[in-house]
C-alpha cells in the first residue's frame, strides 16, 4: 500500500512516528513522509521518501517565535496562540502540500499526526481514507470530563459535575474562537462545515491512541474507531550519552524533555534539591551536545545530552520529568514512579493523569521550587504505592504491536 504520512516537526511527535514508519516498511508498504525540513535526515535513515513543508510555514521548534511571533506566552492565552498560529495556521499549507503529494506518489491513504490538521483536510479534498496517530494524550471533549488543559481529575458527585458545567461555560469563548479560526482555515482550501476543532484532528474511522486505559480517564462516549496501542518506540536514531556510575543507592533521572529545554525550570531545582540526598542523579538536557545546565553539577549527579533508555531505565528508581507524553509512557512501561512538573501545552494534563493513576506526584507547576521537588522525590522513593501504581499498568502501556 502507498501511504502518505504527515507529522508535525517536533521531536516528541517525530520520535514515535519513526517506529511506525520502520514497521510499515518492514511489512513492505511504500511510505512517504511529510514534515519539517530539519527531520529529512532522520527519516532518510529509515530508507523512506521524504518531502519537506513547502506551502506550510516551516519552523525551528527551538525558536518558534522567529516564525510565529505571537507564541511563547504562558497560560491559556499562550496555549490559544500556539494552537491558532502553529497548528491551525499551518493547516491550509499542509493540505495544499499533501494534496499535491497524493497525486505525485499515488497515495492510497493519508496518515496524520493528530496535530497535523492538514491531513484530515487532505482526505476531504482527495477522497482517500484518513488514519490518525495520536502522539499526545486524548484531549477530545467528553461528557464525563472537565475541559482539557486544566489538569483536573474527573469530577465526583453532584458538586463535581456542577464544577465541570461551570468550567465548560467559562471555556466557551475560547472554544468558539478556535472553531472560528479552524473554519477560516478550512475555507482557505475550499472546505466548508466540518467537525469542531476539538475533534478535527481525530479520524472517526481509525484513530490510533498512544497510551492505554490504565493512564487515560474513563469515557463512556469513547468512539468505536479509537484504539489504544501502548507506546510507540522510536527507530532510526540511537540515544547517545554517557552512563552514570552506580553506587548501590537509589538512582533518579531528571529530564526536561526535548521542547522548552530551559534547565532553570526543572533541572536546576532538582539538582539543588537532591545535592545532599543519598541518591545518584542522572540528568539529560534533551539537546544533542549540550551539557551546560547553568550551575555547578553536584558530586552525586551526572549530566549528559541523551541516555540509552532501554539500557538505563531498568536500573532507575524514580524519574523527575516535565511530563512529555512519549517519555512518560516509556517510564511507566518500565514501572518507574514519577514526579511530574507539567507547566504548559498538554503537560498539565499528563501530570494529572500520572497522579490519578497512582503512578506519581503532580507538582502542579512547570517551575517547582527545590524544596517541593525534594519532598516529592523522597516520597515516591519511600512509599511503595507509587511504584505499585506505575507497575499496575506497565504491561498495558508497553507496545502492543498490530
Where are the model-predicted features located?
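N-terminal subdomain of nucleotide-sugar transferases
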Residues: 1-53
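A donor-sugar binding/catalytic signature common to diverse glycosyltransferases
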Residues: 21, 110, 305-353
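Conserved nucleotide-sugar phosphate-binding/catalytic loop shared by glycosyltransferases and other
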Residues: 34-79
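Conserved nucleotide-sugar donor-binding subdomain of glycosyltransferases
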Residues: 66-119, 161, 165-203
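Conserved nucleotide-sugar donor-interacting segment of glycosyltransferase catalytic cores
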Residues: 88-161, 214-216
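Donor-nucleotide binding loops and adjacent catalytic segments primarily
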Residues: 211-318
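C-terminal "capping" alpha-helix adjacent to the active site of nucleotide-linked donor transferases
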Residues: 368-385
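A short, well-ordered alpha-helix in the C-terminal region of glycosyltransferases
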Residues: 385-399
Amino acid at each position: 500500500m502507498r501511504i502518505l504520512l504527515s507529522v508535525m516537526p517536533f521531536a516528541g511527535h517525530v520520535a514515535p512516528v519513526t517506529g511506525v514508519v520502520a514497521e510499515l516498511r518492514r511489512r513492505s508498504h511504500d511510505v512517504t513522509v511529510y514534515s519539517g525540513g530539519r527531520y529529512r535526515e532522520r527519516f532518510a535513515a529509515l530508507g523512506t521518501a521524504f518531502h519537506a513543508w513547502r506551502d506550510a510555514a516551516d519552523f525551528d521548534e527551538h525558536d518558534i517565535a522567529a516564525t510565529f511571533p505571537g507564541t511563547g506566552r504562558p497560560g491559556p492565552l499562550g496555549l490559544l496562540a500556539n494552537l491558532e498560529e502553529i497548528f491551525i495556521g499551518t493547516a491550509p499549507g499542509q493540505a495544499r502540500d499533501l494534496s499535491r503529494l497524493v497525486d505525485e506518489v499515488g497515495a492510497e491513504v493519508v496518515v496524520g499526526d493528530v496535530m497535523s490538521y492538514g491531513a484530515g483536510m487532505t482526505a476531504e479534498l482527495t477522497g482517500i481514507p484518513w488514519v490518525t496517530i495520536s502522539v499526545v494524550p486524548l484531549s477530545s471533549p467528553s461528557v464525563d470530563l472537565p475541559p482539557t488543559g486544566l489538569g483536573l481529575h474527573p469530577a465526583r458527585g453532584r458538586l463535581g459535575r456542577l464544577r465541570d458545567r461551570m468550567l465548560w461555560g467559562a471555556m466557551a469563548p475560547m472554544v468558539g474562537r478556535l472553531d472560528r479560526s479552524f473554519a477560516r482555515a478550512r475555507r482557505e482550501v475550499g472546505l466548508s462545515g466540518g467537525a469542531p476543532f476539538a475533534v478535527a484532528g481525530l479520524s472517526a474511522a481509525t484513530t490510533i491512541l498512544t497510551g492505554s486505559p490504565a493512564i487515560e480517564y474513563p469515557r463512556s462516549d469513547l468512539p468505536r474507531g479509537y484504539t489504544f496501542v501502548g507506546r510507540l518506540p522510536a527507530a532510526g536514531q540511537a540515544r547517545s550519552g554517557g552512563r552514570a556510575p552506580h553506587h548501590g543507592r537509589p538512582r533518579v533521572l531528571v529530564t526536561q524533555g526535548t521542547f522548552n529545554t530551559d534547565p532553570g525550570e526543572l533541572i536546576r531545582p532538582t539538582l539543588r534539591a537532591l545535592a545532599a540526598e543519598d541518591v545518584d542523579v542522572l540528568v539529560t538536557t534533551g539537546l544533542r551536545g549540550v551539557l551546560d545546565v547553568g550551575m555547578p553539577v553536584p558530586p552525586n549527579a551526572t549530566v549528559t545530552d541523551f541516555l540509552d533508555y532501554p539500557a538505563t531505565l531498568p536500573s532507575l528508581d524514580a524519574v523527575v520529568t516535565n511530563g512529555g507524553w512519549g517519555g512518560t509512557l516509556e517510564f511507566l512501561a518500565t514501572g518507574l514512579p514519577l514526579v511530574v512538573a507539567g507547566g504548559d501545552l498538554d503537560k498539565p494534563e499528563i501530570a494529572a493523569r500520572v497522579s490519578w493513576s497512582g503512578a506519581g506526584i503532580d507538582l502542579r507547576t512547570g517551575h517547582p521550587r527545590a524544596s517541593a521537588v525534594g519532598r516529592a522525590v523522597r516520597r515516591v522513593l519511600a512509599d511503595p504505592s507509587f511504584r505499585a501504581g506505575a507497575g499496575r499498568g506497565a504491561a498495558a502501556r508497553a507496545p502492543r504491536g498490530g
